[in-house]
Amino acid sequence: MTQDGYMQQEEEEWEREGLLDPAWEKQQRKTFTAWCNSHLRKAGTQIDNIEEDFRNGLKLMLLLEVISGETLGKPDRGKMRFHKIANVNKALDFIESKGVKLVSIGAEEIVDGNSKMTLGLIWTIILRFAIQDISVEEMTAKEGLLLWCQRKTAPYKNVNVQNFHLSWKDGLAFCALIHRHRPDLIDYGKLRKDNPMDNFNLAFDVAEKHLNIPRMLDAEDVVYTAKPDERAIMTYVSWYYHAFHGAQQAETAANRICKVLKVNQDNERLMEEYERLASDLLEWIRRTTPWLENRTTDNTLPGTQKKLEEFRSYRRQHKPPRVEQKANLETNFNTLQTKLRLSKRPAYMPSEGKMVSDITGAWKGLESAEKGFEEWLLSEMMRLERLDHLAQKFKHKADIHEEWTQGKEEMLVSHDFRQCKLNEIKALKKKHEAFESDLAAHQDRVEQIAAIAQELNALGYHDIASINARCQRICDQWDRLGTLTTRRRQALDEAEQILEKVDLFHLEFAKRAAPFNNWLDETREDLVDMFIVHSIEEIQQLIDAHESFKNTLGEADKEYKTIVGLAQEVQPMATQYQIPGGLENPYTTLTPEVITTKWRDVKQLVPQRDHTLQTELIRQQCNENLRRQFAEKANVVGPWIERQMDAVTAIGMGMQGTLEDQLQRLHEYDQAVVQYRPHVDDLEKIHQEVQEAMIFENRYTQYTMETLRVGWEQLLTSIHRNINEVENQILTRDSKGITQEQLNEFRTSFNHFDKKRTGRLAPEEFKSCLVSLGYNIRNDDRPEFRRILAIVDPNKTGYVHFDAFLDFMTREYTDTDTAEQMIDSFRILAGDKPYITADELRRELPPDQAEYCIRRMTPYNGQCAVPGALDYRSFSTALYGESDL
C-alpha cells in the first residue's frame, strides 16, 4: 500500500472510530496540542485550544512553516471570515502540494472550529511530516515505525510490541526504548509490569527532561482506557524515533567533523614544526657559511694548524647533527604533502625562502664553501711549510755569507802594500787574485740568497720586512766588495812593476786551497741542508745522490793531502832560507789548519747525513704503510657503499614483492648501514693519522675520505627517503583502498617511461604514462592536461614524482571526502539551519574541536540569523581550499 493510500485509509478510519469513542478524542486533543506546541515554541508561540487557535489559519500556517522549513507566503491579516478561510486554504494547499489528499476536510470546518475536522487535519500533518518519512525495509510509515519499536524492544522482558494501543498500556515499552538508547537514564531492572502509572510517569519525565520530548500523553488516559488511541501513541512514539535517529546522525556527523578537524590540526602542527626546523637550519647555514668562506689566516703555521683543528671539529661534531636535521626536514615535508594530498587539502607552500629547494640550495652552497675551505687550508699549510723552510734556508745561507764577509771591506781598503817588498807586493797581488776567485765563487751564494728572498716575497712571508732588509744589506755590501776589489787590483798592478818575486808554493797552495775551501763550505752546507720530501722515491733520490757524493770523497781526500802537502813544503824552505814571514802565505788567508778542520767536519757530517736520510726513509715508509692501510680499507668501504646505494635504488625503482616487503628490505638495509658504521669510523681514524702525517696523495686508491663521506651521507639519505616514500605509498594504498595489483600496474607504467631512472617524469612522459593506463587525454585538450599537471605538480617544478602520480591515479579509482560532505554534517548538527551556534558546537563536539571551530568560523549574516550565529559553510569550503578561511 502506498504512503498516500495509507494516509487516506487512516483519515477514513479516524472519522469512523473517532465518532464512536470520545475517550480517544480526548487523548488526541491532548497529544496533538502538545505536538503542535513543541514545534510552535520554536517560533515563540503556542496554542491552548486546538479548535479555537487554528481558526484564523495564522498559527496553522506558522506550524507548517516551522515543521517544513519552507515559506507559505504572506498571510491575510484581516479578521473577517473570508480572511480566515483564505489563510486555512493556503495551509491546505501547501499540504496537498506535498502529495497529501485531504478527504472531507475543508477550510470552512476549520474556521468554524469543528473539533473532528481540526483533529483530522492535525493528524494528517503529523502523518505527513512526522511519520511518513519513517522508512524501514520498504514498509509503510506505520509498519516501519512498528518494526523499529519491535527491534529496539525485543531484548527486554515483559515487552511485546504488536500494535500502537494495547502493547503500550503498562508503560514498559516506553521505558525500554529510552533504556535501549540511553541506559544511563533508566534502571530497567527495577521496573515492574504491575506498576504502569509509575512506569509511564518515569518514561514521560525522563523523555521531557533529558531527551527534549514534550509530554503528549497523560498516564491516566492510557492506563485507564480499555484501548488507548493509536494515533496519540504513534504521534508520541514518532518523537522517540526522531530523537534517537537524530542523535545517531549527530554522533556520526560529529565524528566526521572531529576526524577532519584532527587531520587539519595535525597538518598545522607539521607545518609549524617544518617552519621551525627550516628556520633553525637556514640560520645555522647562514652563520656557518661566512666562516667557511673566510680565507684569511695570521700567515703562521701554528695559526693555520689551529684553524685546521677547528675545521675538523666542525666536521666531526657540528655538521653530522645538521645532516640528520636536513634529512628529517625533507622527510617531514614529504609526509606533510602526502597527508595533505590524501585529505584533499591544498599543497603546503612554506614561507618565502624556506622551500625544500631553498634549503637544498643553501646546503649546496655550504658544502661548496666547505670543500673550498678544506682545499684552501691544505694548500695554505703546504705554502706556510714551504715558507718556513725557505726562511730557515735564507737565514742559514745569510749567516754563512755574513761570516765570510767579516773583515773583507777592511782588507780591501788597506794600504799595507805600501810598506811591502817586491815579493810581498807580488804576494799581495796573488792573494788578491785568490780573493777574486773566492769572491766569484761566493757569487752563487749571493744569488741564491736573493732568489730565496724573492720567493719569500712572492709567497707572502709574514716577516718579509726583516728578510728584505737583510737581503738588501747583503746586496749592498756585495756591490761595495766588487768595487773595492777592482780598486785594490788596480793598485796592486801598479805596484807589481816594482815587486817581482813570488812564492810559487804559497801561490799554488792558495790556488788549490781556495776552491777546495769553497768546496768544503758548499759541501758542509749541503750536508746540513734541510729537505722536505713526500714519498719514498724522493728520499731515495736524496740517498742515491748522497751515495754518489760519498764516492767522490776519495778524490777529495787526494786533493786535501796535496794541499796540506804544499803547506808542509813551505816550512822547511822558510827555515832553510830564513825567509821573513815565510810561514805566512801571502796569497791567501787560508791555513792548513783551517782546511784540516773543515775537512774533519765534512767527514763527521757524512755519517750524520746518512742517519738523517735513513730516519726520513723510515718515516716515508711509515707514511707509505698508512697510504696502503687507508687504501685497503677505502677500497672495501667504497664499493660496499656503492653496492648498497645500487640496491636501495633498485628497491625504490623495482616492483619485487609487496610494499611491506620493500619497506622491510629497506629497514634491513638501514640496519645494515648502522651496523657497518664502525668500518667508516675506523677509516676516519686512519684518515686522521694520514692528515697528521701530512700525507696529501695516495696512488693506491681512487677514494678520498671526502668522497666516502659524501657517499655515506647520500646512502643514509637515500634509505630514509625511500622508506618515507614506501610508507607514503602504503598510506596512500590503505587510505584509498587500492590493491597491490593496481599499485604494481602503476609502478610498471611509471618505470617504463622513467627511462633514466630518476624517479620522476617530464610532462610529456607523464602524459604518455596516463595514456598507457587507459586515461583518455586528447592531443587537442591542453587545458585538461594543464589542470592535471596543476594537481600532480602544485609547486611547478616541471616534473611529476611517483607519489604525486600515485595519488592522482587513486583519485580515479576511489571515492574521496569533499567540502560538501562537511557542510551536510554541520547541517545535521544545526538541525537543518543554515547556521550553527557555539552552544550547539560545544554540545555535539569534544571541547578542543568545538573551540577550534568557534575561533575559525565567521559570523552568519543571512536571514533568520540569531545572535552568535556562525557560518559553517564558508568554514567547510576553506578546509578544502575552496575559499579563504
From Swiss-Prot:
Domain EF-hand: 741-776, 780-815
Repeat (Spectrin) residue spans along the chain: 270-377, 389-494, 508-614, 626-727
Gene3D superfamilies documented for this protein: 1.20.58.60, Calponin-like domain, EF-hand
Key words, A-Z: Actin-binding, Allergen, Calcium, Metal-binding, Repeat
Role noted for this protein: F-actin cross-linking protein which is thought to anchor actin to a variety of intracellular structures. This is a bundling protein.
Quaternary structure (record): Homodimer; antiparallel.
The protein's name in its UniProt record: Alpha-actinin
Region (Actin-binding): 1-242
Calponin-homology (CH) domain mapped to chain residues: 26-130, 139-245
Sites where the protein binds Ca(2+) 1: D754, T758, R760, E765
Organism of derivation: Dermatophagoides farinae (American house dust mite)
